[in-house]
From Swiss-Prot:
Signal peptide boundaries: 1-19
GO CC field: extracellular region
Subcellular location: Secreted
Coiled coil: none
Residue positions the entry lists as glycosylated: 65
UniProt keyword list: Cleavage on pair of basic residues, Disulfide bond, Glycoprotein, Protease inhibitor, Repeat, Secreted, Serine protease inhibitor, Signal
Disulfide bonds listed in the record: 23-38, 33-51, 36-46, 60-75, 70-89, 73-84
Function of the protein: Both LCMI I and II are inhibitors of chymotrypsin and elastase (in vitro). They both inhibit the prophenol oxidase activation cascade.
Tissue specificity note: Brain and fat body.
Annotated site (Reactive bond): 48-49, 86-87
Name of this protein: Protease inhibitors
Family assignment from sequence similarity: Belongs to the protease inhibitor I19 family.
Length: 92
């Protein structure tokens, strides 16, 4: 439930910020994994996909598991990538 509320708040913030930014009708831009198109009234309208967090470089022992906040990750065979659960962790 907390995750859903946080997600709604984030979407609302993005929409409010975008509403203040004027644009040329028909203009298109990318914002993270979302596509934004300028409406005929000169206001951005964007898709609201839940984007994956940005990837970061890691170094780990291949095959080993480790914690990332409240999520459990398993190190990839290359020692530079990992697959993690996607729990919404409470503020830590």
């Amino acid at each position: 439930m907390k995750f859903a509320l946080a997600l709604c708040a984030a979407v609302l913030l993005v929409v409010l910020v975008q509403a203040e930014e004027k644009c040329t009708p028909g203009q298109v831009k990318q914002q993270d994994c979302n596509t934004c198109t300028c409406t005929p009234t000169g206001v951005w309208g964007c898709t609201r996909k839940g984007c994956q967090p940005a990837k970061r470089e890691i170094s780990c022992e291949p095959g080993k598991t480790f914690k990332d906040k409240c999520n459990t990750c398993r190190c990839g065979a290359d020692g530079k990538s990992a697959a993690c659960t996607l729990k919404a962790c409470p503020n830590q």
